[in-house]
Amino acid sequence: MVNIGVVGATGQGRQVMRNLLEQRNFPATSVRFFASPRSEGKKLTFRGQEIEVENAETADPSGLDIALFSAGATMSRVQAPRFAEAGVIVVDNSSAFRKDPDVPLVVSEVNFDRDVRGKKLAKGIIANPNCTTMAAMPVLKPLHEEAGLQRLIVSSYQAVSGSGIAGVEELAGQARPVIDGVEQLVHDGSALQYPAPNKYVAPIAFNIVPLAGNYVDDGSGETDEDQKLRNESRKILGIPELLVSGTCVRVPVFSGHSLSINAEFSQPISVERTKELLSAAAGVKLVDVPTPLAAAGIDDCLVGRIRQDPGVPDGRGLALFVSGDNLRKGAALNTIQIAELLAADL
């Protein structure tokens, strides 16, 4: 049994984390909740008990074994090292440490054994990947081990909940006022007057926005979401030379990120062998047609529409489609699964 802390215990994804800790019967002797000063003193119910939220900036983390951080990069950069210095193993769900070469970036089914188990953590911190990257990793791992992954071309279809409450409110707020006249869009894309967009660069209701994230000021024309796909895939899969081209798109879906993936390998790999491997892969469910609705609320990433890529010679290419719950496996679940693996070794 372990003593666990949840930092950033209030909010959208944090509720999912608390629910999962209960549902999975996490082996905790005690649980402490931490948040920003404005949430200090609030009461949260966990396992039938009311627990008072502590101030993450001033609380003493001594006595904790593991802390699950889901409070955003700004707080993580300051507080995660402070918790780690107190001897707490930190599993951080923000972007703060993903690029740090001394911090393992982990998907529980993919690289915990390689990068964490039996290793000394240089900074006492483990990073959780971006929710979009997360959906693809359990699918790509067994395929890479079988045939040697060389290149990925990916288009994402990212739910508005990936932008937080603001994204959810923007989609709902734009859809409600125009829903009765939506058929007019068949003939005239300017027929409806949407509320002005705030979160996105264009209306998201009944539309797509091929700009998820923010432009990176490096002349590449890429967004930070595009680059996360590349950088995180390389680090998690352990393929520093992996070629990755990504276009991340925001779509009018409330929950569930999806990816269209074209993968090129060094060796031939058949559709039949691919399905055999994925049927046995941890964290993966093989289906005919994955959708974000079907992925909502389940632990596994859904994969389907698997076919040979005719653009890659010698049977070395695959095309497939993946959907995953961005608030479940894409965030809270992976964090908890890492903590479960850590707890088993304590």
Curated annotation (Swiss-Prot):
<dbReference type="GO" id="GO:0009088">
    <property type="term" value="P:threonine biosynthetic process"/>
</dbReference>
<dbReference type="InterPro" id="IPR036291">
    <property type="entry name" value="NAD(P)-bd_dom_sf"/>
</dbReference>
<comment type="pathway">
    <text>Amino-acid biosynthesis; L-lysine biosynthesis via DAP pathway; (S)-tetrahydrodipicolinate from L-aspartate: step 2/4.</text>
</comment>
<keyword id="KW-0791">Threonine biosynthesis</keyword>
<feature type="binding site">
    <location>
        <position position="250"/>
    </location>
    <ligand>
        <name>substrate</name>
    </ligand>
</feature>
<protein>
    <recommendedName>
        <fullName>Aspartate-semialdehyde dehydrogenase</fullName>
        <ecNumber>1.2.1.11</ecNumber>
    </recommendedName>
</protein>
<keyword id="KW-0457">Lysine biosynthesis</keyword>
<keyword id="KW-0028">Amino-acid biosynthesis</keyword>
<keyword id="KW-0521">NADP</keyword>
<keyword id="KW-0560">Oxidoreductase</keyword>
<dbReference type="GO" id="GO:0050661">
    <property type="term" value="F:NADP binding"/>
</dbReference>
<comment type="function">
    <text>Catalyzes the NADPH-dependent formation of L-aspartate-semialdehyde (L-ASA) by the reductive dephosphorylation of L-aspartyl-4-phosphate.</text>
</comment>
<comment type="similarity">
    <text>Belongs to the aspartate-semialdehyde dehydrogenase family.</text>
</comment>
<dbReference type="GO" id="GO:0051287">
    <property type="term" value="F:NAD binding"/>
</dbReference>
<feature type="active site" description="Acyl-thioester intermediate">
    <location>
        <position position="131"/>
    </location>
</feature>
<dbReference type="InterPro" id="IPR012280">
    <property type="entry name" value="Semialdhyde_DH_dimer_dom"/>
</dbReference>
<keyword id="KW-0486">Methionine biosynthesis</keyword>
<dbReference type="Pfam" id="PF02774">
    <property type="entry name" value="Semialdhyde_dhC"/>
</dbReference>
<dbReference type="InterPro" id="IPR005986">
    <property type="entry name" value="Asp_semialdehyde_DH_beta"/>
</dbReference>
<feature type="binding site">
    <location>
        <position position="228"/>
    </location>
    <ligand>
        <name>phosphate</name>
    </ligand>
</feature>
<dbReference type="GO" id="GO:0009097">
    <property type="term" value="P:isoleucine biosynthetic process"/>
</dbReference>
<dbReference type="GO" id="GO:0009089">
    <property type="term" value="P:lysine biosynthetic process via diaminopimelate"/>
</dbReference>
<comment type="subunit">
    <text>Homodimer.</text>
</comment>
<dbReference type="InterPro" id="IPR000319">
    <property type="entry name" value="Asp-semialdehyde_DH_CS"/>
</dbReference>
<dbReference type="InterPro" id="IPR000534">
    <property type="entry name" value="Semialdehyde_DH_NAD-bd"/>
</dbReference>
<feature type="binding site">
    <location>
        <position position="158"/>
    </location>
    <ligand>
        <name>substrate</name>
    </ligand>
</feature>
<dbReference type="GO" id="GO:0019877">
    <property type="term" value="P:diaminopimelate biosynthetic process"/>
</dbReference>
<comment type="pathway">
    <text>Amino-acid biosynthesis; L-methionine biosynthesis via de novo pathway; L-homoserine from L-aspartate: step 2/3.</text>
</comment>
<dbReference type="GO" id="GO:0071266">
    <property type="term" value="P:'de novo' L-methionine biosynthetic process"/>
</dbReference>
<dbReference type="GO" id="GO:0004073">
    <property type="term" value="F:aspartate-semialdehyde dehydrogenase activity"/>
</dbReference>
<keyword id="KW-0220">Diaminopimelate biosynthesis</keyword>
<dbReference type="GO" id="GO:0046983">
    <property type="term" value="F:protein dimerization activity"/>
</dbReference>
<dbReference type="InterPro" id="IPR012080">
    <property type="entry name" value="Asp_semialdehyde_DH"/>
</dbReference>
<feature type="binding site">
    <location>
        <position position="326"/>
    </location>
    <ligand>
        <name>NADP(+)</name>
    </ligand>
</feature>
<feature type="active site" description="Proton acceptor">
    <location>
        <position position="257"/>
    </location>
</feature>
<feature type="binding site">
    <location>
        <position position="98"/>
    </location>
    <ligand>
        <name>phosphate</name>
    </ligand>
</feature>
<dbReference type="Pfam" id="PF01118">
    <property type="entry name" value="Semialdhyde_dh"/>
</dbReference>
<feature type="binding site">
    <location>
        <begin position="38"/>
        <end position="39"/>
    </location>
    <ligand>
        <name>NADP(+)</name>
    </ligand>
</feature>
<feature type="binding site">
    <location>
        <begin position="10"/>
        <end position="13"/>
    </location>
    <ligand>
        <name>NADP(+)</name>
    </ligand>
</feature>
<feature type="binding site">
    <location>
        <begin position="161"/>
        <end position="162"/>
    </location>
    <ligand>
        <name>NADP(+)</name>
    </ligand>
</feature>
